[in-house]
């Protein structure tokens, strides 16, 4: 289970490495029923009513997202000085890459507007460039799984934009090693697709 984690980016989310080619990973994400991705609702976070669990972020490479089970919403935003979405800018050091993730506020607030809200179901696919900003929403209490395939690495500084105070995020609760038994339980759940408990 090397480089596979539970509570990855947010509570109740698993990241399982399926394949690796050099710096390029193929990972499966699984949101258990206790996940916190419901806090990224485009219909609530856009009004700043609920602090997001995963801020809008780009990646160190181009990615492709493919739905495996359930429904996810890939919510993308873009810069717009007249946009109504006001978010703080944070410099991000990945907990996946170095296991010591942290956010530092840059002192800047940025303004954005919606670019896309794409519902991804089983077999659905979205491709994104490294510079595109997104977050993932899953309905509270439901389970979902999706595949993320990485493209060529890009040299870029990674920022995250959020309506939550990310400097106060407790990383001790995130990026825990996932056991082989947990991975097998997730695999059985995906095969049966019955939404049973992990």
State where each predicted segment sits:
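Short, charged beta-turn/beta-strand-edge "cap" motif at the junction between a beta-strand
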Residues: 132-135
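Conserved short histidine dyad/triad with adjacent acidic residue
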Residues: 1, 26-57, 75-81, 120, ...
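N-terminal, Lys/Arg-enriched amphipathic/low-complexity engagement segments
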Residues: 1-22
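Long, compositionally biased interface segments
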Residues: 155-198
């Amino acid at each position: 289970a090397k480089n596979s984690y539970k509570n990855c980016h947010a509570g109740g989310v698993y990241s399982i490495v399926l394949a690796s080619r050099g710096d390029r990973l193929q990972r499966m994400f699984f949101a258990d029923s206790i996940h916190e991705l419901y806090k990224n609702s485009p219909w609530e976070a856009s009004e700043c009513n609920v602090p997001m669990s995963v801020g809008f972020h780009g990646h160190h490479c181009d990615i492709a997202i493919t739905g495996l089970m359930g429904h996810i919403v890939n919510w993308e935003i873009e810069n717009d000085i007249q946009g109504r979405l006001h978010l703080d800018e944070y410099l991000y050091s990945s907990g996946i890459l170095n296991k010591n993730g942290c956010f530092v506020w840059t002192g800047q607030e940025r303004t954005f507007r919606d670019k896309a809200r794409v519902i991804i179901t089983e077999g659905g696919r979205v491709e994104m460039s490294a510079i595109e900003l997104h977050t993932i929403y899953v309905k509270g209490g439901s389970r979902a799984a999706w595949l993320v395939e990485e493209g060529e690495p890009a040299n870029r500084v990674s920022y995250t934009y959020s309506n939550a105070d990310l400097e106060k995020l407790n990383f001790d609760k995130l990026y825990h090693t996932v056991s082989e038994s947990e991975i097998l339980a997730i695999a059985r759940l995906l095969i049966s697709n019955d939404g049973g408990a992990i």
